[in-house]
């Protein structure tokens, strides 16, 4: 049995890509996209018609150039999502514009708009996750959306404070990052880490155990992997979203896979929810998390602007 098949027996495997061919090849349960992946996917020749459709939709909806750009961007992300939903049996994660990461109301509105585009295409809410950065404002937006029946995937999650606040808000799923945490520690400490000592692996392990210990239903989906060792060290996590090159490596390996994450303790009474002040104080105590959250939002915003430049040339 390949490591990928062994992993499927203990963890829901998700593909972290917008590439339809890769998804067909590895048959994941779900798929996740982000602005960077949408940008990469839109350069593939098979997506030209999806871009043309998004542009035509935006032109028909508004005469205002700025509004056309916003509409085309949303429609392109949804068009790619719709193609992926033809292949995966589960859910697609589609991300809210990262530039709205500190605006609760604008995030809620954008999430509703994305969901309406999916609904108009005949897709029900239970096949979509709206991806939102795990800022305090993003978590508050998700809290409102969850009550409306719009499930969220809180991403760019690097600190225990972020994870705790998401669970307390009743968020459907979180994406704690592994590889980007490792990147930070390698740069800061000038050293290499074995998978079992990988700070990203330790972070996800702690979050997983915290959630199970307090009986939170929020799904933990490890994300952002730099190597297969990081994946095998958190085998047993609720879900793992994995890029095609690492899915390939897992599919080609027959090395034994041992379940690493499994909580067997009793469920304890939950602490009082974090206040906004406590959230910021605790998150701020982790310089890695502060830097990586800010950097992640900036990088996604840069890729959204590149995507907009590509679309603007067609509008």
Curated annotation (Swiss-Prot):
EC code(s) of this entry: 2.2.1.2
Subunit structure: Homodimer.
Name of the protein in its database record: Transaldolase
Disulphide bridges: none
Alphabetized UniProt keyword annotations: Cytoplasm, Pentose shunt, Schiff base, Transferase
Keyword Glycoprotein (UniProt): no
GO aspect biological process, one term: pentose-phosphate shunt
Annotated localization: Cytoplasm
Cited PANTHER family: TRANSALDOLASE (PTHR10683:SF18)
Primary role: Transaldolase is important for the balance of metabolites in the pentose-phosphate pathway.
Reactions accelerated catalytically: D-sedoheptulose 7-phosphate + D-glyceraldehyde 3-phosphate = D-erythrose 4-phosphate + beta-D-fructose 6-phosphate
Pathway field: Carbohydrate degradation; pentose phosphate pathway; D-glyceraldehyde 3-phosphate and beta-D-fructose 6-phosphate from D-ribose 5-phosphate and D-xylulose 5-phosphate (non-oxidative stage): step 2/3
InterPro entries: Aldolase_TIM, TAL/FSA, Transaldolase_1, Transaldolase_AS
UniProt-annotated catalytic positions: 131 (schiff-base intermediate with substrate)
Gene of this entry: tal
Family stated for the protein in its record: Belongs to the transaldolase family. Type 1 subfamily.
MF terms in GO: transaldolase activity
Lineage: Bacteria, Pseudomonadati, Pseudomonadota, Gammaproteobacteria, Pasteurellales
Highest taxon of source: Bacteria
């Amino acid at each position: 049995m390949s490591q990928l098949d062994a992993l499927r027996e203990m963890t829901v495997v998700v593909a972290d890509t917008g590439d339809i061919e890769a998804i067909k090849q590895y048959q994941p349960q779900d798929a996740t996209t982000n602005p960077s992946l949408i940008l990469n996917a839109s350069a593939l020749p098979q997506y030209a018609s999806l871009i043309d459709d998004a542009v035509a939709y935006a032109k028909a909806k508004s005469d205002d150039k700025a509004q056309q750009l916003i509409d085309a961007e949303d429609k392109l992300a949804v068009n790619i999502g719709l193609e992926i939903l033809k292949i995966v049996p589960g859910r697609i994660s589609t991300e809210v514009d990262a530039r709205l990461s500190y605006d609760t109301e604008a995030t809620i509105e954008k999430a509703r708009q994305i969901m309406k585009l999916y609904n108009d295409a005949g897709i029900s809410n239970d096949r979509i996750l709206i991806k939102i950065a795990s800022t305090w404002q993003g978590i508050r937006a998700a809290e409102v959306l969850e009550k409306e029946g719009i499930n969220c995937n809180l991403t760019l999650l690097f600190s225990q404070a972020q994870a705790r606040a998401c669970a307390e808000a009743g968020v459907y799923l979180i994406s704690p990052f592994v590889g980007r945490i490792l990147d930070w520690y390698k740069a800061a400490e000038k050293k290499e880490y074995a998978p079992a000592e990988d700070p990203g692996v330790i972070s996800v392990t702690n979050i997983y155990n915290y959630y199970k210990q307090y009986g939170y239903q929020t799904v933990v989906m490890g994300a952002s992997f730099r190597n297969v060792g990081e994946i095998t060290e958190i085998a047993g996590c609720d879900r793992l979203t994995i890029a095609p090159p690492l899915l390939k490596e897992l599919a080609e390996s027959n090395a034994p896979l041992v379940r690493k994450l499994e909580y067997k303790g009793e469920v304890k009474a939950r602490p009082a929810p974090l206040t906004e002040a406590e959230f910021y104080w605790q998150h701020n105590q982790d310089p890695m998390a502060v830097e990586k959250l800010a950097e992640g939002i900036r990088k996604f915003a840069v890729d959204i602007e590149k995507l907009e430049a590509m679309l603007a040339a067609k509008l």
